[in-house]
Amino acid sequence: MQQYLDLMKHILAEGVDKSDRTGTGTRSVFGYQMRFDLSKGFPLVTTKKCHMRSIIHELLWFLKGDTNIAYLRDNKVSIWDEWADENGDLGPVYGAQWRSWPTQSGEAIDQISQVIAQIKSQPDSRRLIVSAWNVGELDKMALAPCHAFFQFYVADGKLSCQLYQRSCDVFLGLPFNIASYALLTMMVAQQCDLALGDFVWTGGDTHLYSNHMEQTALQLSREPRPLPTMTILRKPASIFDYQFDDFALSNYDPHPHIKAPVAV
């Protein structure tokens, strides 16, 4: 994942120092893009160990339409703990918007079911989009969506996906985001009987937190290793029927984990 290291170098060289909501401070660039050919390996960062188990459980949690962290806690995933209220609720975050976007008439739109049906019936559509950025409900969310919307694209029998991330914590969050959406693309491709194309990541405010600089320097001192392979072991009847044990990551040989504080 040399692209990921190149992004870090770009921020350090070309970024500007900015204040932020958390009060931590960042070095930031605006507008950046990376492209990963999913047929050439699973894009999981190798210059530090990433917790793929948490990534899988979080994605399955999104797809359930869940917005309470009980499922995550039951599976020893703590990445949302800092934002949940005393009951474990987060408000209408990703899962709610993906699976039950509210309409003015009081009904709800299941965007995931809708986009899969559209990929199957209208693969050339330019409207294969899922959005988590519901302006009318932002004030009810514990955290406004960082990975705000994504679009699918079908060409030559291959499925590609582009994510727009309006705000990106490059050291801690980005490796999770890339792996999560790459895996989602694999799942949707399987459900739609398509081969794998590219995952394209596009960032808005793309930043390194000021208290991640030592960790960034350590990571930049390491050489990337070959990408691992992700295998989906079965094809369930629906995108919503995948289980944790359906995914097998192989040949992942990362450098050691690098600990860093989360800006809340």
UniProtKB/Swiss-Prot annotation:
GO terms for biological process: dTMP biosynthetic process; dTTP biosynthetic process; methylation. It catalyses: dUMP + (6R)-5,10-methylene-5,6,7,8-tetrahydrofolate = 7,8-dihydrofolate + dTMP. GO terms for cellular component: cytosol. The keyword Cell membrane does not apply. It holds the Pfam family Thymidylat_synt. (6R)-5,10-methylene-5,6,7,8-tetrahydrofolate binds at H51, D169, A263. It comes from the Bacteria. Keywords: Cytoplasm, Methyltransferase, Nucleotide biosynthesis, Transferase. PROSITE patterns: THYMIDYLATE_SYNTHASE (PS00091). The keyword Hydrolase does not apply. GO terms for molecular function: thymidylate synthase activity. Belongs to the thymidylate synthase family. Bacterial-type ThyA subfamily. Homodimer. Catalyzes the reductive methylation of 2'-deoxyuridine-5'-monophosphate (dUMP) to 2'-deoxythymidine-5'-monophosphate (dTMP) while utilizing 5,10-methylenetetrahydrofolate (mTHF) as the methyl donor and reductant in the reaction, yielding dihydrofolate (DHF) as a by-product. This enzymatic reaction provides an intracellular de novo source of dTMP, an essential precursor for DNA biosynthesis. This is Thymidylate synthase. It comes from Shewanella oneidensis (strain ATCC 700550 / JCM 31522 / CIP 106686 / LMG 19005 / NCIMB 14063 / MR-1). The gene is thyA.
